Structures are given as C-alpha cells and as structure tokens.
Amino acid sequence: MDPVAGLVLGLCCLLLLSLWKQNSGRGKLPPGPTPFPIIGNILQIDVKDISKSLTKFSERYGPVFTVYLGMKPTVVLHGYKAVKEALVDLGEEFAGRGHFPIAEKVNKGLGIVFTNANTWKEMRRFSLMTLRNFGMGKRSIEDRVQEEARCLVEELRKTNALPCDPTFILGCAPCNVICSVILHNRFDYKDEEFLKLMERLNENIRILSSPWLQVYNNFPALLDYFPGIHKTLLKNADYTKNFIMEKVKEHQKLLDVNNPRDFIDCFLIKMEKENNLEFTLGSLVIAVFDLFGAGTETTSTTLRYSLLLLLKHPEVAARVQEEIERVIGRHRSPCMQDRSHMPYTDAVIHEIQRFIDLLPTNLPHAVTRDVKFRNYFIPKGTDIITSLTSVLHDEKAFPNPKVFDPGHFLDESGNFKKSDYFMPFSAGKRMCVGEGLARMELFLFLTSILQNFKLQSLVEPKDLDITAVVNGFVSVPPSYQLCFIPI
C-alpha cells in the first residue's frame, strides 16, 4: 500500500474511533462542550489559564460537566458543593489518582502522589506515620523549622538591604526542612550540590505550569517523539532521582535498625523487616522524590507570592508587624503557640493562600468504581478535575474574591474565622500529606522575616503586578526584586 494512502486510512480510522467513543458514552456522562475528533476540546481551552476556561464552561453547563482532553473524557467538578460532595462525602469513590502522563513517566507507578489502589494506601499510611513519629505538627519538626527560619533570616541579612530576587533564598528554606526530615541533614545555602538540586526543582515547577506541558499531558504518545521542554523536565527528574539514590546508598552503609535518624532509615528498616513488594529501593527513591517536590516548591512559591502581596499592601505588612511586636517581641523566635494569639497574622496567611490559588485545578482524581453522581453515570477510571479556584474564589464565602482582603478570615470582633471553603491543600482522602508541615513553615518563616525586616519595594506599590505569569498546574508569581531592611 502507498505510504500516503496508509497514513490517510490510519487517520480516518482514528477519526471514526474517536467519534464512536465520544458518542457511545455521551448520554451517560454529564453534558459539556462538543469535542472535536481526536483532539477533543483542547482548542476551546486556554492552556495558559485552564481554570478560567473551566469557569466559562460551568456558566453554560453547570457545576458538573464533561470535557474531552484528547480522546479521553474528563469530568469537571466546579463549585464548593460539587467538590465537597465528591472528595469528602464520596471520598472512597473519588480517591483514585487521575492520569498525569509526564509524572507517570517519571514515577513509573511508584511513590506517594501518583499511585493508586494498595500501593498508594501503603505508601501514604507509612509516610504519614513516619512523619508524625518524627513530629510533623509537633515539637521536633517545629524545632527544625525554627532553626531553618533563623538560618533564613541570617541569609537575608547578607543581602545588606540591597535589591535582590528572593526566589532562590525562599526555595532553600523549605527544601532544607525536607532534607532535615528525610536525610537527617541540612545544607549550607552556598553548597554546590544543594544549588544544583534547587535549580532543577525550581525549573521543573515552571515547566509543569507551562502551556506546552498542558498540551503534552493530553497527547504524550505523539509528543514523546518531538523535542520540547518535557525532555528538560525528565532530565531534571533523573538528576534528582540520582541524587536521592546516592543518599540512600550512604544511609544503607550507616543504618542502625535500633536508631532510625530520618525517613530513609525508617523505610530501609521496613524493607529489612518485612517482605513487602510495595517497599523497594525504587519505591523509596520515588517516595522521597515526591516529598521533595510536594514539600519544597509549593511552599517556596507560596512564600514568594506572600512577600509580593505584602509589598503590594504595605498597610497589611505593617499591621502584621505590630501584632508580632505585641505578641512575640524582638528577643525570641516565633513558635506555633503564638499563632492562636495572632488572629490577624493567621488571617493574612490564609488569605494569601486563598488569593493566590496555588493549584487551580488540583491534581487529577479518578473514580475507583462506577459512580452515579447527581444523576450522571461516571464509569470506573474516569479522570476527575476539581476546580479549587471555584471554591477559593467563591463569591458567597468570600465577598470580592478577586480582592486581597484578610478580612475574609476575620469576624466582626477581629477574631480568626475558619471557612469550610478554604481548600488550598485539596480535601478528602487525597489531601496533601504535608499539610501540617506546610502550615507550620508558612507561619514561622513569614513571622521570622517580618520580625526582623521591613520589606521595601523598588517601585510604588500601586505599580506592582501581582498577576500570575502562568496559571497552569501551579500559579507562578511574576519575578520581582525587593530590599530586606533590618529593623
């Protein structure tokens, strides 16, 4: 057969298969925009701001609708009621991890974040238990975060009040906390090995949020054969995994089963004591890789956005500093017990997380069995997108949601006010493993910075742009410089 004729025939077959798939199950799934053959709804979605496109679809199709990402149907849940009903009320049914091709290529079915079924349950249970035993949310981890906060302050002093881009320094602090818990070791901010690791972690979070990665995740089989930044991401991931494997080998040589020092030691001991197929060197490397990714860049991006918002709103920063002066003073480090006495600071940190909407569409979920949801039938294995933007920016819960206002989390008496709509860490069975650690880091790092420095912008606050430069997988703040003026 002529090659051209064969290609045309193949494309026609794909077209017919696509149309058949879309029409055969169309009546069962929730409504949604009409997909194009093969490519689905990708041309109707702004890959630079997927969340915005989903909001527009929800205005037409309601809080539960279907989009086709390529030939694959994905059900989207928009708004607090739909998201809570799925992730909390039907938590077991919606506890699957949806497809995320670039991550699956890196993790190969291992680890904590992108696994399913028994592998996920075993790894999540072990990770939570181990982190809690090392004091996640308790005293010993708090000591480590306080130590790192002091190191961060000293590093900021070295800027000598000169203009600087805080990206790297703010990335080092949470990464060092993770290193302390996982590797029983923190790094100097000038350590070359540490610098290389930070560069790759930082680059990968930017790549993950790029429009190209959104396209790649919908057509991985095709785009694997083309050059692109997904190749850089995979190269960076290999570097990080090799770094972790070297640390694992060092731990194996010094392992004392009666005195585990960190997460890696605990994992190696479990491997020795139990003949469990879930616990292998490969799964250890990916578990640590997941903890690095989840525990470093999400917190550092939030910190970076925090300082930008405080530069934009100097009156908010000044009021936080007044509360720090009143409750903590200048002669001791902030501690977690202070938070309950600092309602305004607590409200500011919550409002930062709400406003920046770090993970607009959350990590993809999947249904673990056939589910009837609001009179729609969702087949087992269907990917689910939960719009966290629609929850965090809900107008009923947060009047003027596009405005940065700590009052969203304060009552009339100025006391801190909780909200069920506060879901920056997702909700339900797939809720972020490191939520407690992240909350602690944000409070202790930010209060330590504001206890010691006045933040000074290089431009007038009104001229600062706080719009995310990319709003894909993660909301990435624009680059900026500031001066840390010692108090």
UniProtKB/Swiss-Prot annotation:
Heme binds at C432. It holds the Pfam family p450. Induction: P450 can be induced to high levels in liver and other tissues by various foreign compounds, including drugs, pesticides, and carcinogens. It is found in: Endoplasmic reticulum membrane; Microsome membrane. Its EC number is 1.14.14.1. GO terms for molecular function: heme binding; iron ion binding; oxidoreductase activity, acting on paired donors, with incorporation or reduction of molecular oxygen, reduced flavin or flavoprotein as one donor, and incorporation of one atom of oxygen. Its main location: endoplasmic reticulum. Keywords: Endoplasmic reticulum, Heme, Iron, Membrane, Metal-binding, Microsome, Monooxygenase, Oxidoreductase. InterPro entries: Cyt_P450 (IPR001128), Cyt_P450_CS (IPR017972), Cyt_P450_E_grp-I (IPR002401), Cyt_P450_sf (IPR036396), Cytochrome_P450_fam2 (IPR050182). It catalyses: an organic molecule + reduced [NADPH--hemoprotein reductase] + O2 = an alcohol + oxidized [NADPH--hemoprotein reductase] + H2O + H(+). CDD domains: CYP2C-like. SUPFAM superfamilies: Cytochrome P450. Its cofactor is heme. GO terms for cellular component: endoplasmic reticulum membrane. It comes from the Eukaryota. One of its GO terms (biological process) is xenobiotic metabolic process. Belongs to the cytochrome P450 family. This protein differs from other forms of cytochrome P450 in that it catalyzes the 21-hydroxylation of progesterone, resulting in the formation of deoxycorticosterone. Cytochromes P450 are a group of heme-thiolate monooxygenases. In liver microsomes, this enzyme is involved in an NADPH-dependent electron transport pathway. It oxidizes a variety of structurally unrelated compounds, including steroids, fatty acids, and xenobiotics. This is Cytochrome P450 2C4.
